[in-house]
Regions:
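His/acidic metal-ligating clusters that form di-metal
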Residues: 77-84, 159-238, 267-269
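N-terminal active-site segment of His-dependent metallophosphoesterases
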Residues: 18-102, 182
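Core catalytic region of metal-dependent phosphoesterases/phosphodiesterases
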Residues: 69-139, 143-144
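Active-site-proximal beta-strand elements of phosphoester/diester hydrolases
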Residues: 53-63, 146-156, 186-188, 238-244
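Stable alpha-helical elements in mature extracytoplasmic
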Residues: 52, 65-72, 88, 99, ...
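Active-site glycine-centered loops adjacent to acidic/histidine catalytic or metal-binding residues
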Residues: 61, 89-90, 119-120, 190, ...
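Bacterial N-terminal signal peptides
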Residues: 5-17
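Binuclear metal-dependent phosphoesterase catalytic core
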Residues: 21-38, 42-43, 59, 142, ...
Length: 271
């Protein structure tokens, strides 16, 4: 009788515990939408086709600041002039799977499409694998109107320099890929040169490739958590860095037919 009662007690405890079983934080168990960037790039290219003027928002480093990111989404949704949003990376703090899913679900509340770059924190643990599943390749490009956006993984430090980051082969291919479809270009990254995470040994080579893009307007970055507008090399190209979400700001860029690299048209918006 005692053995029988013990059996039923253990069975009840086991069944009760089944509902409490959780996945390991780095298990890359993905629920919900995957390949987000590809889906949204289709929308961006379709929505902007034929446009000669485009306007887009840039932000980044939303890790930890979920409330501020939710408020950013609400802020953008109030505007009717934004074509799309670029998230400059660092959606996660520790590369935990759920961090990516929480951020994805918040950003999916935008009324306009968005793309997300990979940041250095997103590479921690199994973060890169999660990023690739949820968002897609770490290097990608798209065309909005007549402007090509080249989005790069520049987080060399997180790979211990064991992989070609930046990927110069990808950058070179994108110089001519779909070249008849764009007149201007923008290069986007999480960590710009000379920020510690970037492989500064190849900074000049990187800039050589950057300046080969047709009608280069400027470069965007995140990572430092502070707004900056820097000319890093002797070529006049602006590297414009967004604040982290904790500061509740974002950048809005406008690229029109008359736009040039000498004077990028943008505003720092507080919300």
């Amino acid at each position: 009788m005692l053995r029988k009662n013990l059996y039923w007690l253990l069975l009840c405890l086991f069944l009760a515990g089944c509902g409490m079983i959780d996945y390991h934080p780095y298990d890359v168990h993905i629920s919900g939408e995957t390949n987000v960037n590809a889906h949204n790039i289709e929308k961006i290219e379709a929505n902007c086709k034929g446009k000669t003027t485009i306007r887009f928002a840039v932000m980044g480093d939303s890790q930890r600041w979920y409330d501020a990111t939710e408020d950013f989404v609400k802020e953008i949704n109030k505007r009717d002039s934004i074509d799309f949003v670029i998230h400059g990376g660092d959606m996660s703090d520790f590369g935990v799977t759920k961090e990516f899913l929480w951020q994805r679900d918040i950003m999916n509340g935008l009324k306009v499409p968005y793309v997300a770059l990979i940041g250095n924190h997103d590479c921690l643990g199994t973060g890169e694998e999660t990023y690739k599943t949820v968002f897609g390749p770490t290097n990608f490009s798209f065309i909005a109107g007549n402007v090509k956006f080249v989005c790069l993984n520049t987080n060399a430090l997180e790979y211990d320099y064991s992989e070609p980051i930046p990927n110069f082969t990808f950058m070179e291919e994108e110089i001519t890929n779909r070249s008849d479809e764009f007149e201007k270009s923008v290069v986007c990254m999480h960590a710009r040169p000379f920020t510690g995470v970037f492989n500064d040994n190849v900074a000049k080579v990187f800039q050589h490739y950057v300046t080969q893009y047709k009608g280069l307007q400027f470069c965007t970055a995140a990572h430092t958590h502070h707004f900056r507008d820097d000319i890093l090399f002797d070529d006049g190209i602006h590297y414009i860095t967004s604040d982290c979400m904790d500061y509740r700001t974002y950048l809005v860029f406008t690229i029109a037919p008359e736009s040039t690299s000498e004077n990028p048209d943008y505003e720092l918006v507080e919300y």
